[in-house]
Amino acid sequence: VPALFAEKARVATLDAAKMAGIEVISLINEPTAAACYYASLPNVKKITGNVLVFDLGGGTFDCSMINIQGEKVEVITSRGDKWLGGKDFDKELINVINQKYKKETGQELDIENKYSLYMEMAEQIKRALSIRDKQAEVIEGPAGPKKIEISRKEFELSIQTHIEKLKMLMEEVLDGSGLKPENISHTLLVGGSTRIPIVTKTIEQVMKKPPLKGVNVDEAVAAGAAVYAGLQSKKSLNEAQKQAISNVK
C-alpha cells in the first residue's frame, strides 16, 4: 500500500482482499517493497542506510525516505500528491497539440468528445520524447488531419509547474527526515513516469547525484512485494521445520 495510506485506507485494503478470498499475511508499504526489489537484483550494489524512494506513476506521486539496516526497512517520512502523475503531463501535451493545431488551421480540436483518443496520442508523444528531441504525429481534427511536431523542450516547458511541485515535495521529505542529500546513499526510481528525462534531471539537481537506473521501474513495487512474500514464506517454513524437529524430540 502507499506509505501515505491512513489506517482507514489500510483496513479497507484488507477488507477488499478478504472479500476476494485472499489471505493477507501482512501489508507492506510501497517504498519498502521497492527497496526489497532493488536489494534483490544481482547487478545492483548493496543498498543500505538512508534511501530516497521516488515513485511517480500515471496518477499519483509518492516520495519516501527510508532507512535500511540488513533486513530491517523503516519508513522515516513520506510526502506525495495523490492527484499528480503522468496523466497530468499528457493533459499538458494535449494543450500544446491543440495550440499548434489551432495555429495551423484556425480551429481547435474537439477535446471534450475525443478526450480518450487525444490522451492516448499524447502519451505516445510523451514516451517518444523520452528518447528523442522531437516527435511528429498526424493529428485528426475538425479541419482535417495535420502533421504536428513537438520538441522535448516544449513538452518540458508545458509541465514545468508539475516539475516544481515534485521538487518541492522532495525537499519536504529531506526537511522532514532531518537529512541532507549527502546523507542519502541512493535514490530509487519507481513508476513509468520516472523515465522522463526532466524528472531524473530534477532528482539529480535536488539529491546532488543521479538516481539508480537500469531496472524495471514499472514492476518494482509488485516484484518487491513478491520478494518480501518469499522471505516471509521462507521464515514460516524454517519455523515450521524447527517446530517439527522439536515435536520429534
Which ranges hold each PLM region?
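Oxyanion-binding/catalytic loops of NTP- or PPi-dependent enzymes
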Residues: V1-K249
